[in-house]
Amino acid sequence: KKIVCLEGDSAFGFSLAEVETMARYGMDVLIFVINNGGVYHGDSKDSDEWLKLRQNSLEGVKDGLRSTSLGWEVGYEKIAEMCGGKGYLVRTPDELSQATEEGFKATVPVVINVIIEAGQAKKVVSSFGSRPFLVPQHRLMTPH
């Protein structure tokens, strides 16, 4: 039986070493990593902006990466490849469809790294436990 997992990039950071265990025991697992470059949302709209924020952090300058930032488009799919599984990096619906089809055919651990918008232009407006949701800035209601 195939096991299908859906995790954010932050959650996958805590469990990525288990891909080696899955490969070692021949587990048939398909993992989708929803990658926005941050715990709630990323900090940057592109790699140049992220590198500038990172440099500010390294130099101790104001306006660096937030503590909830993650690396820019980290290649999580490579974890599966390094352990004997398969990995796919996807950015488009067509790539996602193709990788999903291949992932369901495979009998080794598969990681599909789904790059989505970082969401830096959004803000967390509510949180239920650890489940915040994001709303685009133009849709936020302001009190009158």
Go through the PLM ranges and name each one.
Residues 1-144:
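Thiamine diphosphate
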